[in-house]
Regions:
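Short aromatic/hydrophobic "clamp" motif used to bind/position activated sugar donors
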Residues: 125
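N-proximal low-complexity "stem/linker" segments adjacent to membrane-targeting elements
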Residues: 1-32
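Active-site-proximal specificity loops/subdomain of glycosyltransferases
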Residues: 81-116
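Histidine-anchored nucleotide/phosphate-binding helix
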Residues: 38-52
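The conserved acidic donor/metal-binding loop of glycosyltransferases
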Residues: 129-133
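Conserved donor-nucleotide/metal-binding helix-loop-beta segment in metal-dependent transferases, i.e.
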Residues: 136-162
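Conserved small/polar residues in nucleotide/adenosyl-binding loops
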Residues: 335-340
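Catalytic core and acceptor-binding pocket of nucleotide-sugar-dependent glycosyltransferases
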Residues: 158, 177-274
Length: 347
């Protein structure tokens, strides 16, 4: 039985439906975000719509905050692409007691709410982190058929050495055969709920023994619970890249012509004004084709962002801007309490 019942969790729901009749062959796509990701989420949805005009998609955004301006933008986006977008404002009280870090807030647990909410409503949900940009067709995901007992289709994270590390740390030997990134989950809703995944995950996250082992919060927990019940599909659906890799002398960029979803992991996101690299292009194209087209890219607001902004400005040979942002960074160290803070962003 789920610990995340609709009546306790969903406070408000806003529906922006400009496709009057929902197609029977529709892919439902869900995001779980806090206010820091509203901009990115809107553009992520635009990127999917821009590259999949022949596919019927309905979008579901679960958030703990939304302004009137945000609602207007999401409504305009649905109207622009003749689509359907639903916003759910949620009560996070039951999630705030769960473990969090400077990089992952309680918003990372919204995917549990999502998987439970759609039980008996839809058979399949594509969950995506909001720091993605789509640059290809998702028709294969629309047509995807789950095999018997399969709970989710997923994409592996990193390499065999990492899988073995997770298998050892999480005392789950089966993970040596594959460990997935939870930023992409094509979920079999019935199987997820029949196996009580959300409830079991929350119980593990409240167990001190498990909390002492996990470093990647719900991602670690889901890998343990779903081991042997997932199918690993092509990496093109979750091609992870940190824009901070651009600071290296040599960059191995996995994004190619086959990539469907670029997943911008790490603290620098494509909506930051210092993320001026070719890998951000898919995001910027979608932004230009969305209601957010006239919104400025975000400037740094805390010590961690000033530091990364300065590094990137020097890499881009904008030396005066680099010096300015280093000065802002050191000013934060001297006069504010956020010197040790990182941006509260999903990785």
């Amino acid at each position: 039985m789920s610990q995340l019942n609709d009546s306790d969790i969903i406070l408000f729901e806003y529906n922006f439906h400009y496709q009057n009749i929902r197609s029977k062959n529709t892919l439902d796509i869900a995001f779980g975000i806090d206010r820091n990701f509203l901009f990115g989420c809107g553009v992520a949805i635009a990127s999917i719509l821009l590259n999949n005009r022949e596919i019927s998609c309905e979008f579901h955004v679960f958030t703990d905050y939304i302004s009137d301006k945000d609602k207007l933008y999401f409504s305009d986006l649905a109207k622009q692409y003749n689509s359907r977008i639903n916003i759910y404002v949620i009560n996070c009280d039951k999630l705030k007691s769960l473990p969090s870090t400077k990089n992952w807030t309680y918003a990372t647990y919204f995917r549990f709410i999502i998987a439970d909410y759609f039980y008996n409503k839809h058979e399949k949900i594509l969950y995506l982190d909001a720091d993605i940009a789509c640059k290809g067709s998702i028709k294969e995901l629309l047509d995807y058929q789950f095999s018997t007992n399969e709970i989710a289709a997923v994409v592996t994270e990193r390499d065999v050495e990492w899988w073995q590390n997770r298998a050892s740390v999480l005392t789950t030997p089966q993970l040596a055969s594959g460990y997935f990134n939870a930023g992409f989950l094509l979920i079999n809703i019935d199987e997820w709920n029949l196996n009580n995944i959300s409830s079991k995950a929350i119980e593990m996250l409240r167990d001190p023994d498990w909390v002492s082992k996990i470093t990647h919060l719900d991602q670690d927990v889901l890998n343990v619970l779903l081991n042997g019940k997932v199918k690993f599909i092509s990496g093109k659906y979750n091609t992870r890249y940190s824009i901070n890799y651009e600071l290296k002398d040599k960059v191995d960029n996995p994004v190619n012509d086959d990539t469907v979803f670029i997943h911008y992991v790490g603290p620098t996101k494509p909506w930051h004004e210092w993320a001026d690299y070719p890998v951000s292009r898919s995001f910027l194209i979608a932004k230009a084709s969305s209601p957010w087209c006239k919104e400025d890219l975000l400037k740094p607001v805390n010590s961690n962002q000033y530091r990364y902004c300065a590094k990137h400005k020097f890499k881009q040979k904008h030396y005066m801007a680099g010096i300015f942002n280093y000065l802002k960074y050191y000013n934060c160290l001297l006069y504010t309490s956020d010197a040790a803070d990182d941006v509260a962003l999903h990785c």
